[in-house]
Structures are given as C-alpha cells and as structure tokens.
Amino acid sequence: MKLLRYGPSGQEKPGILDSAGRIRDLSAHVPDLAGDVLSDAGLARLRAIDPATLPLVSGEPRIGACVGHVGKFIGIGLNYADHAAEAGMPVPKEPVVFGKWTSSICGPNDGIDIPKGSVKTDWEVELGVVIGAKCKDVDEARALDYVAGYCVVNDVSEREWQIERGGQWDKGKGFDTFGPIGPWLVTRDEVPDPQRLDLWLEIDGHRYQNGNTRTMVFTVAQLVAYLSTCMTLQPGDVITTGTPPGVGMGVKPSPVFLKAGQTVRLGIEGLGEQLQRTRNAQ
C-alpha cells in the first residue's frame, strides 16, 4: 500500500493511493496514520479495504508528512562510505546517531526555510524507515519485522550549526522545515529489499546525488537492531538512514549551498518524489 496524509498543515487526513494513483480518503476507518494503525494488524485492516469503495479526494490537496504524531525522528550520519570521504570524515565503526527535532517535520512539497543568516544550508536525500511495533533489544534477523514501511526524507542540514559551532550535530539538523517526509508511506510488503533502492536529488535541474542503498555502511536491519539496544523504538518513530555522496559541502572545487528561490527535487525508487522551493525564513 501507498499511504499518505493530505490537507492543510495540522489538519491532515489519512489517505491511500488507488490503482490509478488517485487519493482515497481513509478517515472513516482510521483517525491518522500513527500509533497502532502502523502495526501489522492495523495495516492488515487497511489492506482489507477495497480502495474503490472509499471517497475519492478531488483536486490537488497539499500532501503532508506521511506519518502523524512522530515520537522520535532519528538521524544516522556518514552511513555511505563515499559520503564520509567527501565530508572528510572517517567511516564510522558504529552508527553515528543524532536527533532531528519533530518540529522540523513538514510535507514533501512544502517550502524549505533558509535560516536567518545561513549561508551553508545543504541537502541530503535519504531512505526513511517508519517503525510499526514497539521494538527493544531485537536482533538483526528479526529487525525488519518491526518496520511498517519506507519513505523519502530530505535531511536538510545547516553545516555551520552542525559542524563549525561545536557541540552536537542536532542543532544544525533541526531547524523548522528541515525534515520533509513523504509523499507516501510504502508498506514493508511492497519493498522486498530496502538495500536495493536507487535514490537521487537535483537542484534547479542539476543532479547532485545519484546513489543506491546497497552502498550503506550499516543496513536498515542493522540500524533498527542497533538503535533498539539503546532506546525503545515506538510505532511511528522515523529513522532517516544517511545520504549518498553529492551533498553541497562536498562539491569540488568549492562547496555549493542552497539559496532562496531554488527548486529541490528528490526521490527514491518506488517511494515517490519530493519537490521543494527554498525561501528565506521570516
């Protein structure tokens, strides 16, 4: 299934794409795509519904983040060896874990706000993993059983705040609008191998990132198992799993960063595309 949330910010309704790619309304069946709705049992109930029997959503509504009420938004850094090289950092021996504030979450086509005074706002196309069941101390072999599905994430990052100003990465990762998620939550059964997905990103039509999840340092299963040892993962938690090379700070001979008025387009094979315009934060 391709599940989504649509409507004005803060008033999103749950929906599903039908076989023709049209949005059907699910709000008579579930209040949101969150919590227990994301469990295997909850998704099975949705799967049993014939989309053709659901109300058709007219027009072109705003698409919100594909998961509601996200409890934890967990980032993984330097998870592609070639990205670590372009950043001038060693390939990690264990996952680099940081937090993205849930207040950064927005829809896949919402605008990106360039923070006041920022000259180093950067892009990162990433595979997002949505947890579907409470998960603590699971082993790698069973880790994917706890995944509800997958989505596209743009891990927008302000490099001065992330790297140059000391302390943790979190403060450069969590500005408002720095977490576009979606358009769809594609359920686990439709993604047979999360380590075989092409992902890409373009700025103003120029392709900067072109990678595949097979080159991850730590696989999705390894990340879920690892994180479950140091925290309890809950339904609706989102893990964004790192980015392939081609970020702005790695461009040679001189880094390239986002400016107001640009168009960012990104996508992952089978998971949909995002389209954002950049603007100066007010």
Curated annotation (Swiss-Prot):
<dbReference type="GO" id="GO:0050385">
    <property type="term" value="F:ureidoglycolate lyase activity"/>
</dbReference>
<dbReference type="InterPro" id="IPR011234">
    <property type="entry name" value="Fumarylacetoacetase-like_C"/>
</dbReference>
<keyword id="KW-0460">Magnesium</keyword>
<comment type="similarity">
    <text>Belongs to the FAH family.</text>
</comment>
<keyword id="KW-0378">Hydrolase</keyword>
<feature type="binding site">
    <location>
        <position position="126"/>
    </location>
    <ligand>
        <name>Mg(2+)</name>
    </ligand>
</feature>
<feature type="binding site">
    <location>
        <position position="124"/>
    </location>
    <ligand>
        <name>Mg(2+)</name>
    </ligand>
</feature>
<dbReference type="InterPro" id="IPR036663">
    <property type="entry name" value="Fumarylacetoacetase_C_sf"/>
</dbReference>
<dbReference type="GO" id="GO:0016787">
    <property type="term" value="F:hydrolase activity"/>
</dbReference>
<feature type="binding site">
    <location>
        <position position="155"/>
    </location>
    <ligand>
        <name>Mg(2+)</name>
    </ligand>
</feature>
<protein>
    <recommendedName>
        <fullName>Putative hydrolase Bcenmc03_4750</fullName>
        <ecNumber>3.-.-.-</ecNumber>
    </recommendedName>
</protein>
<keyword id="KW-0479">Metal-binding</keyword>
<dbReference type="GO" id="GO:0019628">
    <property type="term" value="P:urate catabolic process"/>
</dbReference>
<dbReference type="InterPro" id="IPR051121">
    <property type="entry name" value="FAH"/>
</dbReference>
<dbReference type="GO" id="GO:0046872">
    <property type="term" value="F:metal ion binding"/>
</dbReference>
<dbReference type="Pfam" id="PF01557">
    <property type="entry name" value="FAA_hydrolase"/>
</dbReference>
